[in-house]
Amino acid sequence: GIPVEALRKIGAAISTAPADFNVNPKIVRQLKAKAAMFETGEGIDWATGEALGFGSLLLEKHRVRLSGEDCQRGTFSQRHAVLIDQVNQNTYAPLNNIDPAQGVFEVYNSLLSEFGVLGFEYGYSLADPNALVLWEGQFGDFANGAQVIIDQFIASGETKWLRMSGLVLLLPPGYEGPGPEPSSAPL
Protein backbone atom coordinates (compact mmCIF):
# COMPACT_ATOMS: atom_id res chain seq x y z
CA GLY A 1 0.00 0.00 0.00
CA ILE A 2 0.83 3.65 0.05
CA PRO A 3 2.59 4.86 3.21
CA VAL A 4 0.38 6.96 5.49
CA GLU A 5 2.90 9.83 5.40
CA ALA A 6 2.65 9.94 1.59
CA LEU A 7 -1.15 10.08 1.81
CA ARG A 8 -0.92 12.93 4.31
CA LYS A 9 1.48 14.80 2.06
CA ILE A 10 -0.83 14.40 -0.95
CA GLY A 11 -3.85 15.32 1.18
CA ALA A 12 -2.19 18.53 2.36
CA ALA A 13 -1.35 19.48 -1.23
CA ILE A 14 -4.82 18.88 -2.65
CA SER A 15 -6.70 20.60 0.17
CA THR A 16 -4.80 23.90 0.23
CA ALA A 17 -3.88 26.73 -2.11
CA PRO A 18 -1.14 29.36 -1.73
CA ALA A 19 -2.03 32.12 0.74
CA ASP A 20 -1.85 34.82 -1.95
CA PHE A 21 -4.08 32.88 -4.37
CA ASN A 22 -7.65 34.19 -4.68
CA VAL A 23 -9.74 31.02 -4.71
CA ASN A 24 -13.46 31.09 -5.50
CA PRO A 25 -15.42 30.80 -2.20
CA LYS A 26 -17.23 27.66 -3.42
CA ILE A 27 -13.88 26.01 -4.09
CA VAL A 28 -12.60 27.11 -0.67
CA ARG A 29 -15.52 25.17 0.86
CA GLN A 30 -14.57 22.10 -1.18
CA LEU A 31 -10.93 22.37 -0.13
CA LYS A 32 -11.99 22.60 3.53
CA ALA A 33 -14.21 19.54 3.07
CA LYS A 34 -11.23 17.65 1.62
CA ALA A 35 -9.08 18.70 4.57
CA ALA A 36 -11.80 17.36 6.91
CA MET A 37 -11.79 14.05 5.01
CA PHE A 38 -8.09 13.69 5.71
CA GLU A 39 -8.44 14.66 9.37
CA THR A 40 -11.19 12.11 10.03
CA GLY A 41 -10.38 9.49 7.40
CA GLU A 42 -14.08 9.41 6.52
CA GLY A 43 -16.13 10.40 3.50
CA ILE A 44 -13.37 10.16 0.92
CA ASP A 45 -15.13 10.60 -2.40
CA TRP A 46 -14.22 9.41 -5.91
CA ALA A 47 -12.42 12.63 -6.92
CA THR A 48 -10.33 12.60 -3.75
CA GLY A 49 -9.46 8.93 -4.22
CA GLU A 50 -8.48 9.71 -7.81
CA ALA A 51 -6.23 12.57 -6.64
CA LEU A 52 -4.62 10.31 -4.03
CA GLY A 53 -3.90 7.73 -6.73
CA PHE A 54 -2.43 10.33 -9.07
CA GLY A 55 -0.42 11.85 -6.23
CA SER A 56 1.04 8.50 -5.20
CA LEU A 57 2.28 7.92 -8.76
CA LEU A 58 3.70 11.44 -8.88
CA LEU A 59 5.63 10.82 -5.65
CA GLU A 60 7.11 7.75 -7.36
CA LYS A 61 8.29 10.15 -10.10
CA HIS A 62 5.83 8.96 -12.76
CA ARG A 63 4.24 11.39 -15.21
CA VAL A 64 0.43 11.60 -15.06
CA ARG A 65 -1.35 13.12 -18.06
CA LEU A 66 -5.12 13.69 -18.22
CA SER A 67 -7.05 15.24 -21.11
CA GLY A 68 -10.65 15.74 -22.09
CA GLU A 69 -13.13 18.51 -22.65
CA ASP A 70 -13.53 19.55 -19.01
CA CYS A 71 -10.79 17.70 -17.14
CA GLN A 72 -9.35 20.50 -15.07
CA ARG A 73 -12.63 21.14 -13.27
CA GLY A 74 -14.17 17.72 -13.82
CA THR A 75 -17.33 17.00 -15.79
CA PHE A 76 -19.44 17.16 -12.63
CA SER A 77 -17.37 19.92 -10.95
CA GLN A 78 -15.76 17.27 -8.77
CA ARG A 79 -12.05 17.35 -9.61
CA HIS A 80 -10.68 20.91 -9.49
CA ALA A 81 -7.22 19.70 -10.52
CA VAL A 82 -6.44 23.26 -11.61
CA LEU A 83 -7.52 26.24 -9.54
CA ILE A 84 -8.00 29.66 -11.17
CA ASP A 85 -7.21 32.87 -9.31
CA GLN A 86 -10.39 34.96 -9.29
CA VAL A 87 -8.47 38.25 -9.61
CA ASN A 88 -5.71 37.67 -12.17
CA GLN A 89 -6.70 34.34 -13.80
CA ASN A 90 -3.41 32.67 -12.81
CA THR A 91 -3.63 28.91 -12.43
CA TYR A 92 -2.43 26.57 -9.71
CA ALA A 93 -2.32 22.77 -9.94
CA PRO A 94 -2.19 21.32 -6.41
CA LEU A 95 -0.94 17.94 -7.65
CA ASN A 96 2.15 19.64 -9.07
CA ASN A 97 3.00 20.92 -5.60
CA ILE A 98 3.31 17.79 -3.46
CA ASP A 99 7.10 17.46 -3.44
CA PRO A 100 9.93 19.18 -5.35
CA ALA A 101 11.24 15.83 -6.64
CA GLN A 102 7.89 14.46 -7.85
CA GLY A 103 6.81 13.56 -11.38
CA VAL A 104 4.90 15.97 -13.60
CA PHE A 105 1.09 16.23 -13.55
CA GLU A 106 -0.44 17.49 -16.78
CA VAL A 107 -4.15 18.14 -17.14
CA TYR A 108 -5.57 19.64 -20.32
CA ASN A 109 -9.01 20.82 -21.26
CA SER A 110 -9.25 19.74 -24.88
CA LEU A 111 -11.43 20.84 -27.73
CA LEU A 112 -14.51 18.76 -28.46
CA SER A 113 -12.84 16.63 -31.14
CA GLU A 114 -12.75 13.19 -29.57
CA PHE A 115 -11.25 11.54 -32.65
CA GLY A 116 -8.29 13.93 -32.70
CA VAL A 117 -7.72 14.15 -28.96
CA LEU A 118 -8.01 10.42 -28.28
CA GLY A 119 -5.79 9.70 -31.28
CA PHE A 120 -3.15 12.06 -29.90
CA GLU A 121 -3.33 10.54 -26.41
CA TYR A 122 -3.04 7.03 -27.87
CA GLY A 123 0.16 8.11 -29.62
CA TYR A 124 1.40 9.78 -26.44
CA SER A 125 0.83 6.57 -24.47
CA LEU A 126 2.98 4.66 -26.97
CA ALA A 127 5.74 7.29 -26.88
CA ASP A 128 5.86 7.37 -23.05
CA PRO A 129 4.77 3.94 -21.79
CA ASN A 130 5.87 4.76 -18.22
CA ALA A 131 3.38 7.62 -17.93
CA LEU A 132 -0.21 7.20 -16.81
CA VAL A 133 -2.10 8.67 -19.77
CA LEU A 134 -5.86 9.15 -19.37
CA TRP A 135 -8.58 10.50 -21.64
CA GLU A 136 -11.91 11.45 -20.12
CA GLY A 137 -15.00 11.45 -22.31
CA GLN A 138 -17.43 14.24 -21.62
CA PHE A 139 -20.86 13.39 -20.17
CA GLY A 140 -23.19 12.20 -22.91
CA ASP A 141 -22.30 10.09 -25.91
CA PHE A 142 -19.14 11.97 -26.79
CA ALA A 143 -17.02 8.83 -27.06
CA ASN A 144 -18.87 7.94 -30.26
CA GLY A 145 -16.70 10.39 -32.22
CA ALA A 146 -13.66 8.49 -30.97
CA GLN A 147 -15.00 5.02 -31.74
CA VAL A 148 -12.69 4.55 -34.73
CA ILE A 149 -9.65 5.23 -32.51
CA ILE A 150 -11.00 2.80 -29.92
CA ASP A 151 -11.65 0.05 -32.48
CA GLN A 152 -8.73 0.48 -34.87
CA PHE A 153 -5.98 1.41 -32.42
CA ILE A 154 -6.72 0.86 -28.73
CA ALA A 155 -8.61 -2.44 -28.95
CA SER A 156 -6.62 -3.95 -31.82
CA GLY A 157 -3.25 -2.18 -31.90
CA GLU A 158 -1.43 -4.85 -29.93
CA THR A 159 -2.62 -7.57 -32.30
CA LYS A 160 -1.88 -5.52 -35.42
CA TRP A 161 1.46 -3.97 -34.53
CA LEU A 162 2.62 -5.74 -31.33
CA ARG A 163 2.46 -2.38 -29.52
CA MET A 164 0.75 -2.23 -26.15
CA SER A 165 -0.89 0.94 -24.90
CA GLY A 166 -1.66 1.67 -21.28
CA LEU A 167 -4.07 4.46 -22.24
CA VAL A 168 -6.93 4.68 -19.73
CA LEU A 169 -10.39 5.77 -20.86
CA LEU A 170 -12.50 7.50 -18.24
CA LEU A 171 -16.10 7.49 -19.37
CA PRO A 172 -18.24 9.21 -16.74
CA PRO A 173 -21.72 8.37 -18.03
CA GLY A 174 -21.29 4.61 -18.39
CA TYR A 175 -24.53 3.02 -19.58
CA GLU A 176 -26.80 5.64 -18.06
CA GLY A 177 -25.73 8.56 -20.31
CA PRO A 178 -28.37 10.29 -22.38
CA GLY A 179 -28.71 9.86 -26.11
CA PRO A 180 -29.48 7.12 -28.62
CA GLU A 181 -26.32 5.10 -27.91
CA PRO A 182 -25.59 5.55 -24.22
CA SER A 183 -23.06 2.74 -23.96
CA SER A 184 -20.23 5.28 -24.44
CA ALA A 185 -17.34 3.48 -26.09
CA PRO A 186 -18.09 -0.23 -26.09
CA LEU A 187 -15.09 -2.42 -26.77
Where are the predicted features?
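Flexible, glycine-rich loop/tail regions that form catalytic "lids" or insertion modules at the edges
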Residues: 1-187
